[in-house]
């Protein structure tokens, strides 16, 4: 360091400025140093060394070397304290290792004596070996010893594997909890050690700044007021001789610049810095003591864990190697003997029951075979009957369908024929109506002709009758009345003749009378011939009159019948037009029939296609029938399966009977077990009392350990808070000590703010006191273990930040590397 400083002095240039320019960055020397530096031994030395600016360089170098020596002495004191702590820890570790070695040797000796291990040389080497022997050899020896012990233990009696596995899992869980607690404690210890290292580093910086603060030479160089003469300097501060040598030139240069009232302010600042330094040292010492006590507690807990593991191993060894007398006198052995006797009795009864069941099973098999044959024969006959019935039903259905089609066709044909008949009847009605009218006309014409004939013959009565009669019925009535009148007149004449004959004589008188009468008739005839010519003329006149009368009546009748003739002609004309219309309609019908024929052809082809489809459906129906037949067969199989299941159910019933018998036997067994359990209960009550006493002791011990652990955690938290306060005090002290260095103060302020920010990030956001050591895998928010445990215990399992519900399995430890 001195050589580098001297090399730097050789490369420096001389100052050309005057003293009136104010304080410079370069160092100013006094007159004494200038005189001592003014006698060079080298002839080639230039005049730069004789310049006043380099006069105080030697004093500055000496003071810097002295400050480095003080810093080295402080570091040496710290190292000696740490070495003493390490030596104490080493002594404690050696003592614990010796105790553990003695315990291990005693344990191996006891195991060798109890288990009668053949290879005694392996355990002899353990006691004869040196504690400072090779670590590899010790590991090999321990491995040999453990393998020998395991072989001997494996050769012993049966071990309750389930119980050992359960104990192993419990021990593994307990070990994981201890490991977790150890990791948390180690992390806290590491944080405390890091904080202690940072505090020590800051303390060394503060001490260095304090020493520089008390140097008048540096204060004069930096342009600050000097320390008063009455200030007390501690043993770690620079010697006052250096200050006296540097007072001459520096005071002269800074007299004009320093204020007159700076001494009281400087002493107060110095006293404040000294107080802060002492408080920081006390905090560091307190932190170191707390760290040592915490490490001692960790070592104590580790020792307790090892002791508990050794006790557990001894207990397991005792459980696996019980003496024969203890086994014979134990209640479990007696219970096993009782159970063995009961089991033998049960075995004998089971054999007898099994023989009876085999006989019954043979009889049941024979009955089942006979019943199966009978059921199969009945099912086959019934299935055949059902098949015949299905075929007959299908034939009936086919026949009924064909008859239905024939009847539908016949009904359609009859409807068409009835329609034709109705049409013909209408036409015949029209013809009959016209025929009646023509008959009426003909009858009227016949009546006129009769009138003409009657007039020609001179029948006035006939002419008058025909003229007055309107119809043949009237004429017939008139003729009937005239005939009746004529008959009545003839009957009257015959009656008169009979009366006249009766009055005459029966012989001559009558003939004479007839002769006379004949003569009278001849006379009358002659008279009538004469009068005949006159009567003929009168008759011709009468006949002509009658003809005229008949012609007049005929003309009147013709006039009356003219309207009827015109109406009949109109009817005939209409009927003729109807016939023409019928002909056109028939032509249209013929065309329609042709169209219908084409449609019928299409229908025929579609019917043929439908027939093909029906044939396909028939084939499908046949296939369905086959499938149904198969289904019937499957049902027959199912029926057989049901028969088998019925046999199985019968077996189940017999099994249920067996189970009932077994349950009865079980009840008897349970009664015997109840008696054994009562005897066992008395023994368990005694064991429970012993276990409850030991459990109370263990619970009290665990509560004490829990309280100690809680107090230790609280003390750790308190120490962390004290450490944070000491850090803040040290930061304030450093800030007050380096107040004149603006850039350094700014950097320190930035570092403190960054440190506070990082510390706030590491602290729990819920309590703002402890650090984060738990994470919620549900939302990945981190908190301290106390806050999470309090929410788990109170069953308010929601995240304090986002209020998301979480389970106990979602809480995991947070590892910061």
Swiss-Prot record:
Q: Show the segment(s) annotated as Disordered.
A: 1-48, 497-534, 730-750
- ZnF bounds (RING-type): 764-803
Protein name per the record: E3 ubiquitin-protein ligase BRE1
Source organism superkingdom:
Eukaryota
Q: What is the lineage of its organism?
A: Eukaryota, Fungi, Dikarya, Basidiomycota, Ustilaginomycotina
Q: Does the keyword Transferase apply?
A: yes
* Gene that produces this protein: BRE1
Query: What organism is listed for this UniProt entry?
Result: Mycosarcoma maydis (Corn smut fungus)
> Coiled coil: which residue ranges?
160-222, 265-505, 532-579, 658-739
Q: A single Gene Ontology molecular function, please?
A: ubiquitin protein ligase activity
């Amino acid at each position: 360091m001195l050589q580098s400083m001297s090399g730097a002095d050789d490369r420096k240039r001389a100052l050309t400025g005057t003293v009136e320019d104010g304080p410079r960055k370069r160092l100013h020397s006094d007159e004494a140093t200038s005189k001592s530096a003014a006698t060079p031994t080298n002839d080639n030395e230039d005049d730069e060394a004789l310049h006043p600016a380099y006069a105080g360089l030697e004093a500055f170098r000496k003071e810097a070397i002295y400050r480095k020596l003080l810093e080295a002495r402080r570091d040496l004191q710290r190292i000696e304290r740490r070495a003493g702590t390490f030596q104490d820890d080493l002594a404690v570790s050696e003592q614990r290792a010796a105790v553990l070695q003695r315990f291990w040797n005693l344990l191996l000796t006891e195991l060798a004596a109890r288990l009668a291990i053949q290879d005694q040389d392996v355990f002899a080497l353990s006691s004869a070996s040196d504690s400072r022997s090779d670590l590899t050899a010790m590991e090999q020896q321990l491995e040999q010893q453990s393998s020998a012990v395991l072989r001997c233990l494996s050769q012993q009696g049966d071990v309750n594997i389930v119980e050992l596995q359960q104990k192993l899992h419990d021990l593994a869980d307990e070990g994981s909890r201890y490991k977790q607690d150890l990791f948390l404690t180690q992390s806290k210890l590491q944080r405390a050690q890091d904080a202690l290292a940072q505090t020590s580093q800051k303390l060394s910086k503060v001490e260095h700044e304090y020493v520089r603060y008390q140097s008048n030479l540096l204060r004069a160089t930096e342009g600050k007021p000097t320390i008063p003469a009455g200030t007390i300097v501690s043993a770690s501060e620079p010697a006052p001789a250096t200050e006296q040598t540097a007072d001459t030139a520096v005071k002269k240069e800074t007299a004009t610049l320093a204020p007159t009232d700076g001494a009281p302010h400087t002493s107060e600042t110095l006293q404040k810095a000294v107080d802060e330094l002492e408080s920081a040292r006390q905090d560091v010492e307190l932190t170191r003591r707390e760290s040592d006590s915490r490490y001692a507690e960790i070592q104590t807990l580790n020792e307790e864990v090892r002791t508990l593991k050794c006790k557990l191993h001894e207990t397991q060894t005792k459980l696996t190697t019980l003496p024969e007398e203890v086994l014979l006198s134990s209640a479990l052995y007696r219970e096993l003997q009782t159970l063995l006797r009961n089991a033998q009795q049960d075995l004998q009864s089971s054999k007898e029951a099994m023989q009876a069941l085999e006989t019954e099973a043979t009889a049941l098999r024979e009955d089942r075979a006979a019943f199966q044959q009978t059921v199969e024969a009945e099912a086959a006959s019934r299935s055949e009957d059902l098949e015949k019935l299905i075929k007959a039903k299908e034939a009936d259905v086919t026949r009924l369908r064909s008859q239905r089609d024939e009847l539908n066709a016949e009904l359609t044909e009859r409807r068409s024929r009835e329609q034709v008949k109705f049409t013909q009847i209408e036409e015949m009605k029209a013809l009959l109506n016209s025929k009646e009218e023509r008959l009426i006309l003909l009858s009227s014409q016949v009546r006129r002709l009769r009138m003409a004939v009657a007039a020609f013959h001179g029948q006035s009565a006939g002419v008058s009758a025909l003229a007055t009669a309107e119809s043949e019925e009237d004429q017939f009535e008139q003729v009937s009345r005239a005939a009746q009148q004529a008959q009545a007149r003839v009957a009257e004449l015959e009656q008169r003749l009979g009366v006249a004959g009766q009055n005459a004589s029966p012989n001559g008188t009558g003939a004479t009378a007839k002769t006379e009468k004949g003569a009278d008739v001849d006379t009358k005839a002659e008279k009538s011939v004469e009068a005949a010519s006159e009567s003929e003329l009168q008759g011709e006149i009468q006949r002509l009159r009658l003809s005229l009368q008949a012609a007049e009546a005929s003309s009147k009748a013709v006039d009356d019948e003219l309207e009827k003739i015109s109406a009949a002609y109109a009817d005939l004309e209409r009927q003729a037009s109807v016939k023409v219309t019928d002909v056109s309609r028939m032509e249209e019908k013929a065309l329609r029939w042709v169209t219908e024929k084409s449609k019928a052809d299409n229908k025929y082809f579609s019917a043929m296609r439908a027939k093909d489809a029906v044939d396909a459906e028939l084939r499908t129906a046949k296939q369905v029938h086959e499938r149904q037949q198969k289904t019937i067969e499957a049902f027959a199989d199912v029926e057989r399966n049901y028969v088998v299941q019925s046999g199985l159910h019968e077996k189940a019933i017999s099994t249920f009977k067996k189970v009932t018998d077994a349950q009865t036997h079980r009840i008897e067994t349970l009664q015997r077990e109840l008696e054994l359990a009562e005897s066992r209960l008395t023994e368990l009550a005694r064991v429970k009392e012993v276990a409850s006493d030991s459990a109370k002791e263990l619970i009290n011990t665990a509560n004490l350990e829990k309280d100690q652990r809680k107090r230790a955690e609280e003390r750790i938290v308190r120490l962390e808070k004290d450490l944070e306060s000491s850090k803040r005090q040290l930061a304030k002290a450093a800030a007050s000590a380096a107040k004149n260095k603006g850039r350094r103060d700014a950097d320190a302020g930035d570092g403190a703010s960054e440190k506070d920010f990082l510390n706030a990030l590491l602290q729990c956001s819920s309590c703002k006191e402890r650090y984060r050591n738990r994470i919620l895998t549900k939302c990945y928010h981190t908190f301290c273990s106390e806050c999470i445990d309090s929410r788990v215990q109170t069953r308010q399992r929601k995240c304090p930040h986002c209020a998301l519900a979480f389970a106990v399995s979602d809480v995991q430890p947070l590892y910061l590397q």
